[in-house]
Amino acid sequence: MATHILLKNNIMPTDNRPTLAIDTSTSFLSIALEHQSEICLFHENVGTKQSEQILPQIERLFKEAGITAADLGCIVYAQGPGAFTGLRIGAAVAQGLATPFDTPMIGIPCLDAAASLLPPSSCVLAATDARMGEVFYAWFDTQNHVRLSDYTVGKASAIAAPEGQTPSGGIGNAFALADKPPFDGQADMPTAADYLKLARSGRYLATDAAHAELLYVRNKIALTAQEQAQQKAKP
Protein backbone atom coordinates (compact mmCIF):
# COMPACT_ATOMS: atom_id res chain seq x y z
CA MET A 1 0.00 0.00 0.00
CA ALA A 2 1.24 3.48 -0.84
CA THR A 3 2.40 5.72 1.98
CA HIS A 4 0.82 9.18 2.07
CA ILE A 5 2.93 11.79 3.83
CA LEU A 6 1.62 15.30 4.30
CA LEU A 7 4.18 18.02 3.78
CA LYS A 8 4.92 20.03 6.91
CA ASN A 9 3.09 23.28 7.54
CA ASN A 10 4.76 26.37 8.91
CA ILE A 11 4.41 30.09 8.37
CA MET A 12 7.29 31.77 6.55
CA PRO A 13 8.51 35.04 8.13
CA THR A 14 6.32 37.82 6.74
CA ASP A 15 8.27 40.93 7.69
CA ASN A 16 9.35 41.46 4.05
CA ARG A 17 13.01 41.26 4.96
CA PRO A 18 15.39 39.85 2.32
CA THR A 19 15.52 36.07 1.92
CA LEU A 20 18.52 34.08 0.71
CA ALA A 21 18.28 30.62 -0.87
CA ILE A 22 21.20 28.23 -1.47
CA ASP A 23 21.22 25.02 -3.52
CA THR A 24 24.47 23.05 -3.73
CA SER A 25 22.94 19.59 -4.14
CA THR A 26 24.45 19.05 -7.62
CA SER A 27 27.51 20.35 -9.46
CA PHE A 28 25.66 23.64 -9.91
CA LEU A 29 26.04 26.52 -7.50
CA SER A 30 22.62 28.14 -7.26
CA ILE A 31 22.03 31.18 -5.06
CA ALA A 32 18.96 33.43 -5.07
CA LEU A 33 18.30 36.62 -3.12
CA GLU A 34 14.78 38.00 -2.82
CA HIS A 35 14.73 41.66 -1.87
CA GLN A 36 11.98 44.24 -2.34
CA SER A 37 9.90 41.78 -4.41
CA GLU A 38 12.76 41.12 -6.84
CA ILE A 39 14.81 37.92 -7.12
CA CYS A 40 18.46 38.00 -8.17
CA LEU A 41 19.86 34.62 -9.17
CA PHE A 42 23.32 33.13 -9.65
CA HIS A 43 23.09 29.67 -11.23
CA GLU A 44 26.16 28.08 -12.78
CA ASN A 45 27.79 24.68 -13.13
CA VAL A 46 30.97 25.19 -11.11
CA GLY A 47 31.90 21.53 -10.68
CA THR A 48 34.09 21.03 -7.62
CA LYS A 49 34.55 24.76 -6.98
CA GLN A 50 31.41 25.34 -4.93
CA SER A 51 33.39 25.92 -1.73
CA GLU A 52 35.56 28.52 -3.48
CA GLN A 53 32.75 30.44 -5.13
CA ILE A 54 29.80 30.30 -2.77
CA LEU A 55 30.79 33.10 -0.39
CA PRO A 56 32.06 35.50 -3.09
CA GLN A 57 28.82 35.04 -5.06
CA ILE A 58 26.69 35.60 -1.96
CA GLU A 59 28.68 38.73 -1.13
CA ARG A 60 28.19 39.96 -4.70
CA LEU A 61 24.41 39.55 -4.43
CA PHE A 62 24.42 41.31 -1.06
CA LYS A 63 26.45 44.20 -2.48
CA GLU A 64 24.16 44.60 -5.49
CA ALA A 65 21.13 44.69 -3.18
CA GLY A 66 22.80 47.00 -0.67
CA ILE A 67 22.34 44.63 2.27
CA THR A 68 24.37 42.45 4.64
CA ALA A 69 23.72 39.08 6.27
CA ALA A 70 22.32 40.93 9.28
CA ASP A 71 19.41 42.16 7.13
CA LEU A 72 18.19 38.69 6.17
CA GLY A 73 14.82 37.55 7.46
CA CYS A 74 15.33 33.92 6.49
CA ILE A 75 17.82 31.58 4.80
CA VAL A 76 16.50 28.73 2.66
CA TYR A 77 18.73 25.77 1.84
CA ALA A 78 18.59 22.57 -0.20
CA GLN A 79 18.17 19.81 2.36
CA GLY A 80 18.88 16.77 0.19
CA PRO A 81 19.03 14.13 -0.98
CA GLY A 82 21.89 15.07 -3.27
CA ALA A 83 25.66 15.28 -3.51
CA PHE A 84 26.97 14.74 0.02
CA THR A 85 29.86 17.22 -0.13
CA GLY A 86 27.79 19.87 -1.89
CA LEU A 87 24.95 19.63 0.63
CA ARG A 88 27.40 20.01 3.51
CA ILE A 89 28.96 23.09 1.89
CA GLY A 90 25.61 24.80 1.39
CA ALA A 91 24.28 23.99 4.85
CA ALA A 92 27.50 25.07 6.57
CA VAL A 93 27.51 28.43 4.80
CA ALA A 94 23.81 28.95 5.56
CA GLN A 95 24.39 28.16 9.23
CA GLY A 96 27.41 30.43 9.34
CA LEU A 97 25.37 33.33 8.00
CA ALA A 98 22.36 32.61 10.21
CA THR A 99 23.96 31.92 13.60
CA PRO A 100 25.28 35.40 14.51
CA PHE A 101 21.90 37.02 13.88
CA ASP A 102 19.52 34.21 14.95
CA THR A 103 18.19 34.13 11.41
CA PRO A 104 15.63 31.34 10.87
CA MET A 105 16.46 28.65 8.32
CA ILE A 106 14.15 26.58 6.14
CA GLY A 107 15.30 23.30 4.60
CA ILE A 108 13.57 22.23 1.39
CA PRO A 109 13.96 18.62 0.21
CA CYS A 110 15.52 18.58 -3.26
CA LEU A 111 12.93 16.21 -4.72
CA ASP A 112 10.12 18.48 -3.52
CA ALA A 113 11.77 21.37 -5.35
CA ALA A 114 12.03 19.31 -8.53
CA ALA A 115 8.40 18.18 -8.33
CA SER A 116 7.26 21.79 -7.94
CA LEU A 117 8.38 22.49 -11.52
CA LEU A 118 5.60 20.31 -12.95
CA PRO A 119 1.97 21.40 -13.42
CA PRO A 120 -0.37 20.29 -10.62
CA SER A 121 -1.11 16.58 -10.92
CA SER A 122 -2.27 13.70 -8.74
CA CYS A 123 0.85 11.58 -9.36
CA VAL A 124 4.27 12.72 -10.57
CA LEU A 125 7.77 11.33 -10.14
CA ALA A 126 10.77 13.42 -9.10
CA ALA A 127 14.06 11.61 -9.72
CA THR A 128 17.65 12.86 -9.58
CA ASP A 129 21.06 11.34 -10.26
CA ALA A 130 22.47 9.68 -7.14
CA ARG A 131 25.66 8.45 -8.87
CA MET A 132 26.93 4.88 -8.50
CA GLY A 133 24.24 3.71 -10.94
CA GLU A 134 21.36 4.82 -8.72
CA VAL A 135 18.79 7.61 -8.49
CA PHE A 136 17.06 9.45 -5.67
CA TYR A 137 13.30 9.52 -6.15
CA ALA A 138 9.88 10.13 -4.63
CA TRP A 139 6.28 10.31 -5.84
CA PHE A 140 4.13 13.40 -5.30
CA ASP A 141 0.55 14.59 -5.58
CA THR A 142 1.32 18.18 -6.52
CA GLN A 143 -2.35 19.15 -6.66
CA ASN A 144 -2.79 18.61 -2.94
CA HIS A 145 0.85 19.08 -1.87
CA VAL A 146 1.16 15.51 -0.63
CA ARG A 147 4.15 13.21 -0.94
CA LEU A 148 2.99 9.71 -1.95
CA SER A 149 6.13 7.77 -1.02
CA ASP A 150 9.26 7.86 1.06
CA TYR A 151 12.41 9.49 -0.29
CA THR A 152 14.26 6.53 -1.79
CA VAL A 153 17.53 5.63 -3.51
CA GLY A 154 17.79 2.72 -5.94
CA LYS A 155 18.04 1.57 -9.52
CA ALA A 156 15.98 3.66 -11.94
CA SER A 157 14.66 0.55 -13.65
CA ALA A 158 13.19 -0.68 -10.37
CA ILE A 159 10.98 2.37 -9.77
CA ALA A 160 7.29 1.47 -9.64
CA ALA A 161 4.30 3.79 -9.44
CA PRO A 162 2.35 3.92 -6.17
CA GLU A 163 -0.45 1.38 -5.96
CA GLY A 164 -3.59 2.56 -7.70
CA GLN A 165 -1.91 5.62 -9.22
CA THR A 166 -1.35 6.53 -12.87
CA PRO A 167 1.74 8.73 -13.32
CA SER A 168 1.25 11.84 -15.43
CA GLY A 169 4.88 12.90 -15.70
CA GLY A 170 8.35 12.98 -14.26
CA ILE A 171 11.05 15.55 -13.57
CA GLY A 172 14.71 15.64 -12.65
CA ASN A 173 18.15 15.00 -14.10
CA ALA A 174 17.70 11.23 -13.69
CA PHE A 175 15.73 11.44 -16.95
CA ALA A 176 18.95 12.44 -18.74
CA LEU A 177 20.71 9.23 -17.70
CA ALA A 178 21.21 6.24 -19.98
CA ASP A 179 19.50 4.14 -17.30
CA LYS A 180 16.56 6.45 -16.68
CA PRO A 181 13.25 5.81 -14.93
CA PRO A 182 10.73 3.80 -17.00
CA PHE A 183 8.27 6.70 -17.20
CA ASP A 184 7.90 9.80 -19.36
CA GLY A 185 9.80 12.70 -17.89
CA GLN A 186 11.92 15.76 -18.49
CA ALA A 187 15.43 16.38 -17.19
CA ASP A 188 14.81 19.89 -15.82
CA MET A 189 16.14 20.79 -12.38
CA PRO A 190 15.17 23.57 -9.94
CA THR A 191 17.23 26.65 -9.22
CA ALA A 192 17.57 28.43 -5.89
CA ALA A 193 14.73 30.71 -7.02
CA ASP A 194 12.40 27.70 -7.00
CA TYR A 195 13.45 26.94 -3.42
CA LEU A 196 12.50 30.51 -2.50
CA LYS A 197 9.04 30.03 -3.95
CA LEU A 198 8.48 26.81 -2.00
CA ALA A 199 9.66 28.42 1.22
CA ARG A 200 7.16 31.23 0.67
CA SER A 201 4.37 28.65 0.44
CA GLY A 202 4.50 28.20 4.22
CA ARG A 203 4.54 24.39 3.97
CA TYR A 204 8.04 23.87 5.38
CA LEU A 205 9.28 24.26 8.93
CA ALA A 206 11.59 27.08 9.96
CA THR A 207 14.23 26.30 12.56
CA ASP A 208 17.24 27.93 14.14
CA ALA A 209 20.67 27.27 12.70
CA ALA A 210 21.65 24.82 15.44
CA HIS A 211 18.78 22.50 14.52
CA ALA A 212 19.01 22.76 10.73
CA GLU A 213 19.37 19.26 9.30
CA LEU A 214 20.22 17.57 6.02
CA LEU A 215 18.21 14.75 4.46
CA TYR A 216 20.17 11.60 3.66
CA VAL A 217 18.63 8.46 2.20
CA ARG A 218 21.79 6.37 1.83
CA ASN A 219 22.84 4.36 4.88
CA LYS A 220 26.42 4.56 3.70
CA ILE A 221 27.59 7.80 2.15
CA ALA A 222 30.87 6.66 0.58
CA LEU A 223 32.04 3.40 -0.92
CA THR A 224 35.62 2.21 -0.78
CA ALA A 225 37.57 1.97 -4.04
CA GLN A 226 37.22 -1.81 -3.86
CA GLU A 227 33.43 -1.60 -3.41
CA GLN A 228 33.13 0.81 -6.35
CA ALA A 229 35.17 -1.55 -8.53
CA GLN A 230 32.95 -4.46 -7.49
CA GLN A 231 29.82 -2.51 -8.41
CA LYS A 232 31.22 -1.62 -11.83
CA ALA A 233 32.05 -5.28 -12.45
CA LYS A 234 28.46 -6.37 -11.88
CA PRO A 235 26.48 -7.16 -15.07
Question: Locations of the language-model features?
Answer:
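Oxyanion-binding and handling regions
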Residues: 2-38, 49-52, 106-235
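Short, conserved active-site loops that position catalytic residues or coordinate cofactors/metal ions
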Residues: 35, 56-58, 79
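A short glycine/serine-rich beta->alpha loop
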Residues: 41-46, 79-83, 183-186
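N-terminal phosphate-binding loop and adjacent alpha-helix
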Residues: 43-65
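Generic structural marker for isolated residues within well-ordered, non-membrane alpha-helices
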Residues: 58, 94, 111
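Phosphate/pyrophosphate-binding loops at sites that engage ATP/ADP/AMP, CoA/4′-phosphopantetheine
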Residues: 58-73, 162-167
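DPxDG-like acidic metal-binding loop motif
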Residues: 74-105
